[in-house]
């Protein structure tokens, strides 16, 4: 498919402020997919480009500073799955409608997964072996982030259960300090610099088709010049068709040269599918770092396929 988007946001400057123009954003994307690549394989090619006008009358921002673009190709097949993506966001990319978490960067991200199906292993349906690589720079090609994650082995059982082991290495360039824990004079701050870290993790998950299912994972890693141990637990109950309740708990123990601290996160989520056309979902979340409880709920009503109402 090929898609397009256009948004306009009117602006009214306050007395004495720089005159603001109405903000216009235009963009296009495409997604081409085939199941007949080389006669028998799946393949996909995607891309997008977006541009917005200068918010200030007579502004001097270049078109490249006010645009973003990206492409992605993938080969999503059973034995071999490979994809690679590239995206770039201008230094002044700031559409009036919508937002991004980061701007002024280039990101390359290839992944290779090999997933054979052993013929002589009675309880093993498939094994997976994956290499994930991320390389992120600023627009002057200065390295900001580099991640290498390797999954030497993931076991997918005939029962639907899974178990995996993963190792990884991270590079992070921090240009400004930030507070990671606490407030005031007792705050623990991470200072600018270059940080490299290693990690390893193990995880196990039971099949989601069961009335009771869950998962557990443990990760040990270097963390901003110190160490972190993390435990993640989850459990789901499906008391009847169309209803589910999931609880997640995460505990982190962090040890840094500046000080030690622990964090806890608890989340409860639910889904109730009243019919094929109506569903209620939501979650409640609390963490002892912010001491804030967040609540989210949504009702979705499908009037007809392609026409949905959300509340």
Provide a role label for each language-model segment.
Residues 36-310:
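Exposed, low-structure sequence patches enriched in small/polar residues
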Residues 1-21:
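A conserved hydrophobic secondary-structure block that centers on an alpha-helix together
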Residues 22-24, 282:
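Accessory structured domains or lobes within enzymes
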